[in-house]
Amino acid sequence: MSDTFQRIAPEQARQLRENGAQVVDIRDPQSFAVGHISGSRHIDNHSVADFIAAADLDAPLVVVCYHGNSSQSAAAYFIQQGFSDVYSLDGGFELWRSVYPADTSSGEAE
């Protein structure tokens, strides 16, 4: 088990997602509704405990924020909660959207 997360580029995040990694978006609900990585799940302080309780702690987890800053703190938190394979998306959703504009979705969180 790793005790630290890795910072990754959008290309690595996309590959991880295609191989089954869970992508979580920690931005505010309005920003998530306007646009997010296709297949990602919105989580916030109210839903994080339920997410952790139901999660496979050994499955890869990619954390996304606006620009790749807040996701680092969240990724460290997930490591502390027992996740073993955690990544923070450098550049956040803004960089993802510029690299993969067709690989985004809009709409409310599930």
Swiss-Prot record:
Its EC number is 2.8.1.1. It is found in: Cytoplasm. Transmembrane segments: none annotated. It catalyses: thiosulfate + hydrogen cyanide = thiocyanate + sulfite + 2 H(+); thiosulfate + [thioredoxin]-dithiol = [thioredoxin]-disulfide + hydrogen sulfide + sulfite + 2 H(+). Residues 17-105 form the Rhodanese domain. It is an enzyme of class 2 (transferase). Belongs to the GlpE family. Transferase that catalyzes the transfer of sulfur from thiosulfate to thiophilic acceptors such as cyanide or dithiols. May function in a CysM-independent thiosulfate assimilation pathway by catalyzing the conversion of thiosulfate to sulfite, which can then be used for L-cysteine biosynthesis. This is Thiosulfate sulfurtransferase GlpE. It comes from Pseudomonas aeruginosa (strain LESB58). The gene is glpE.
